[in-house]
Amino acid sequence: MIQSFTRLAVADNSGAKELMCIKILGGSKRRYATVGDIIVCSVKKALPNGKIKRGQVVKAVVVRTKKELHRGNGSLIRFDENAAVVLDSKKELIGTRIFGPVGREVRYNGFMKIVSLAPEVL
């Protein structure tokens, strides 16, 4: 469950290390984002030679949340951290690698590139 001002780790090699959520896309009064949702973020920490610089505003898709995710079959899944993957303006990946597992809900929302690059889909 991601809301405004939530800090997220970055799960790709785009150069950003930490993001802060500014807005959740998809509805005027939408309060929370979960796995597979697109959010607008500010880059809080970045590598000095990365593609993304500190202070830049980017879009990202959430791939892991600490809050339990309720599946349709009754199962729950929970990750150790909140993490996202940085996107460009055309909603394509900036990085070329994904680190750590991602939730299956990313596939349902049409981000097949993330699913194919991820080492594990849970």
Curated annotation (Swiss-Prot):
Binds to 23S rRNA. Forms part of two intersubunit bridges in the 70S ribosome. Part of the 50S ribosomal subunit. Forms a cluster with proteins L3 and L19. In the 70S ribosome, L14 and L19 interact and together make contacts with the 16S rRNA in bridges B5 and B8. It comes from Campylobacter hominis (strain ATCC BAA-381 / DSM 21671 / CCUG 45161 / LMG 19568 / NCTC 13146 / CH001A). The keyword Protein biosynthesis does not apply. The keyword RNA-binding applies. It comes from the Bacteria. NCBIfam families: rplN_bact. This is Large ribosomal subunit protein uL14. PROSITE patterns: RIBOSOMAL_L14 (PS00049). GO terms for biological process: translation. Belongs to the universal ribosomal protein uL14 family. GO terms for cellular component: cytosolic large ribosomal subunit. InterPro entries: Ribosomal_uL14, Ribosomal_uL14_bac-type, Ribosomal_uL14_CS, Ribosomal_uL14_sf. Keywords: Ribonucleoprotein, Ribosomal protein, RNA-binding, rRNA-binding.
